[in-house]
């Protein structure tokens, strides 16, 4: 298969899983899992999965310094993104949260312009203006409903999560270009998982879903979130 076609198909699958993920998380949060506990579930599962998968992969070279950088990047960037994302989606609607996720490329561009002197064109500025305008309109007009307990706060938190993830993407790309993909996943998820366990120990573990049977609807939805959006979409 042509590499470009393969890349496009991978992107389509990843975005589709992301869309299903938003609706699945909205179903689970906060009724079946508290947002902080949900973050811990995802990151611990993801870290365990990537370390297990790496056993069957070709070894990748990395220095101790790079591994520590990845660990800290995961503890701050990956965990920060996941924490704000799940907290935000528990308050707003899947449609609104998806709008803010789609703004990540805008924040990446803004960060690279401010800190890495990326070239600015009028077309790029127009695109940023349209994207931000749509987001502001969404925040200003989002009404409360059965799916959104606090739409305004949820939208703003999702906005913060998209900015945090953009920072994570820029830093990981600029500082760690020589690191293999599996090494990146292993150590960023490990750092994020450790941070999630620390935070969860402070706030407390809250997951009524653990009293459900394995084949109950909430548990099957959780397994989907853990296996597909959390693990497969990153590979």
PLM regions and their residue ranges:
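Membrane-interface helix termini and inter-helical loops of multi-pass transporters
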Residues: 23-31, 90, 139-151, 201-217, ...
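Juxtamembrane C-cap of transmembrane helices in multi-pass membrane transport proteins
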Residues: 14-32, 45, 83-92, 100, ...
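Hydrophobic transmembrane alpha-helices of multi-pass small-molecule transport proteins
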Residues: 50, 71, 120-142, 162, ...
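C-terminal transmembrane-helix exit sites in multi-pass transporters
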Residues: 49, 54-61, 104-129
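Glycine-/small-residue-enriched transmembrane alpha-helix faces in small-molecule transporters
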Residues: 1-41, 147-174, 194, 198
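Specific transmembrane alpha-helical segments of multi-pass solute transporters/efflux pumps
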Residues: 21-22, 51-101, 137, 226-235
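Transmembrane alpha-helices of multi-pass small-molecule transport proteins
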Residues: 30-80, 107, 164-171, 185-206
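Hydrophobic/aromatic residues within transmembrane alpha-helices
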Residues: 28, 38, 88, 114-116, ...
């Amino acid at each position: 298969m042509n590499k470009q076609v393969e890349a496009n198909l991978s992107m389509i699958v990843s975005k589709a899983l992301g869309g299903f993920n938003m609706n699945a998380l909205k179903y689970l949060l906060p009724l079946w899992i508290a947002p902080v506990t949900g973050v811990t579930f995802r990151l611990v599962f993801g870290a365990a999965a990537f370390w297990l998968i790496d056993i069957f992969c070709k070894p990748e070279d990395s220095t101790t310094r790079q591994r520590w950088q990845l660990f800290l990047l995961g503890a701050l960037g990956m965990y920060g993104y996941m924490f704000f994302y799940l907290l935000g989606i528990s308050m707003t609607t899947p449609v609104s949260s998806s709008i803010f996720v789609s703004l990540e490329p805008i924040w990446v561009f803004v960060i690279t312009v401010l800190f890495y002197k990326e070239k600015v064109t009028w077309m790029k500025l127009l695109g940023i203006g349209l994207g931000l305008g749509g987001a502001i309109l969404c925040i200003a007009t989002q009404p409360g409903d059965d799916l959104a307990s606090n739409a305004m706060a949820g939208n703003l938190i999702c906005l913060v999560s998209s900015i945090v993830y953009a920072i994570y993407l820029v830093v990981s790309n600029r500082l760690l270009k020589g690191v293999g993909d599996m090494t990146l996943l292993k150590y960023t998820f490990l750092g994020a998982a450790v941070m999630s366990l620390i935070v969860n120990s402070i706030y407390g573990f809250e997951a009524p879903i653990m009293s459900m049977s394995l084949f109950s609807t909430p548990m099957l939805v959780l397994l989907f979130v853990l296996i597909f959006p959390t693990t497969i979409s990153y590979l």
